[in-house]
């Protein structure tokens, strides 16, 4: 049996640092009409299975296998922010978690042929402004937007 580790690098946030309310989550979701439909279907699917009782619970649950259409290991709040930004800004982010289960959302460099022209031209300030725009909808508290080195393994 072997064990391997992986590292993800990029500029972004620790999603777990965001303290928000259900009303603010719904406000964020409402910005992206296509994602909003998907989000409400996602909630319905969870409720049909008996989980969860509230949006707050949904935001902390690990994503279940049948909902892996976006990315594995994503929890609710990370999925919501990622979905909104991808639809509204056409910027693709990486959601990942570390050994301690803390979730991160990062703008990670990738092969240029996988990046849009918009992504290729983004500066550090552009990425900072992008995260700040969406995080500020969810909370008035400071959330660090910085270079992230996320390590995990399995």
Across the structure, where does each feature detected by a protein language model lie?
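Acidic (Asp/Glu-rich) sequence patches and key acidic residues
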Residues: 1-138, 153-154
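C-terminal or internal capping secondary-structure element at the end of a domain, subdomain, or sheet
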Residues: 140-154
């Amino acid at each position: 049996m072997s064990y391997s580790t992986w590292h993800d690098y990029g500029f972004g946030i620790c999603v777990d640092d965001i303290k928000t309310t259900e009303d603010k989550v719904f406000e964020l979701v409402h910005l992206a009409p296509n994602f909003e439909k998907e989000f409400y279907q996602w909630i319905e699917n969870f409720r049909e299975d008996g989980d969860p009782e509230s949006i707050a619970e949904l935001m902390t649950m690990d994503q279940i296998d049948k909902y892996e259409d976006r990315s594995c290991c994503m929890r609710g709040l990370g999925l919501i922010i990622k979905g909104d930004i991808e639809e509204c800004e056409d910027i693709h982010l990486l959601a990942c978690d570390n050994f301690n289960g803390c979730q991160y959302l990062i703008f990670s460099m990738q092969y240029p042929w996988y990046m849009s022209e918009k992504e290729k031209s983004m500066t550090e300030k552009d990425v900072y402004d992008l995260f700040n725009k969406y995080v500020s909808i969810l909370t008035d508290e400071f959330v660090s937007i910085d270079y992230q080195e996320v390590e995990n393994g399995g």
